[in-house]
Amino acid sequence: MLRVLGLAGMLMSFNIHAAMISPVSGVKILFANGTEVDEPLEPMEVDAKSAQLVVRYAAELGSGSNQKVFDSAPFVITIDNLSEDIKLYPPKVFSYEQANREFNTSPKWRIEGVSGKEISYSQEKLKGNEGFMPYYGMEALIAKHNEERGIVFSAGVVKAEVVTTDKMVEKPATTKNADALVQLQHWYKQASTEERKAFRKWMVDQE
């Protein structure tokens, strides 16, 4: 049986609530209900009673000479009951080493509604590719993740908070039509610090 998220799952409801989802303190929302998010650090609206968020945490941790930039792997967070505006907080970590330990298993995100109530969720670490650049082509990885679990979405369930005509015109119709340079730039922006270092090292080795 398919697990349906989004508008299709709410045919029995006459009132669809558009919930605002706000990432906090270094949380990036990369995809929402299968749709790529243009501004990962900005609030967005989701027109559905449930949401699947692909998120990543990035922040400078530590102090002084021990300060380092930490980038987590992407995690798939599922919220089954999205009945109010929410804020998504990262786990409380204060050093690079602590963050490594926290995100190595099941990080403790905190999702809080405007009512002050803590919202329940489930999560899985997104499975990447083997070897170099494990999260290159993230859209395909998410599609595979959802296909394996029988998860489907209705079209148009996600709206950016602000969408301008210029942005709609400039955005490529499909990733497949983008040339290799655009795809590399797209991957580089989403890559973690360690992935970027590995990519730069690989580039030097090719020269």
Swiss-Prot record:
Disulfide bonds: none annotated. Keywords: Signal. The keyword Signal applies. Residues 1-18 form the signal peptide. Pfam families: DUF2057. InterPro entries: UPF0319 (IPR018635). Belongs to the UPF0319 family. HAMAP family: UPF0319. This is UPF0319 protein VV1_2115. It comes from Vibrio vulnificus (strain CMCP6).
